């Protein structure tokens, strides 16, 4: 039986295992034939969407991994706009609205409100939080 999943990632890109575990879980879901329609990054998890994250050359690049996963499997990557702005992860639209000189939301990520998460949860069979 194929299920539709939504993941909520609260853990930062580095510093805890939460985001990396979410990524590995996503790979396992897809390998088992399940559908993963959206990954919503909330609280500290919004840091997964920063284009300014530069891991050491011998470390796993989780931001790039999320981007590749999204491209390969057509998965939406959404960061909570309010949580992201508080933590300095800013998309083009928000940079313009707030008269900031730059944006740093990584390619493939979009910013959304909690309504985006609620919408995804309505159509999901399972919601898993990391």
Curated annotation (Swiss-Prot):
Taxonomic superkingdom: Bacteria
Alphabetical UniProt keywords: Cytoplasm, Transferase
Enzyme active site: 80 (cysteine persulfide intermediate)
EC class name: transferase
GO-annotated molecular function: sulfur carrier activity; sulfurtransferase activity
The EC number(s) this enzyme carries: 2.8.1.-
Subcellular location: Cytoplasm
Main location as per UniProt: cytoplasm
Entry-linked InterPro entries: DsrEFH-like, Sulphur_relay_DsrE/F-like, Sulphur_relay_TusD/DsrE
GO biological process: tRNA wobble position uridine thiolation
Family in the record: Belongs to the DsrE/TusD family.
Function comment: Could be part of a sulfur-relay system.
Protein name according to UniProt: Sulfurtransferase TusD homolog
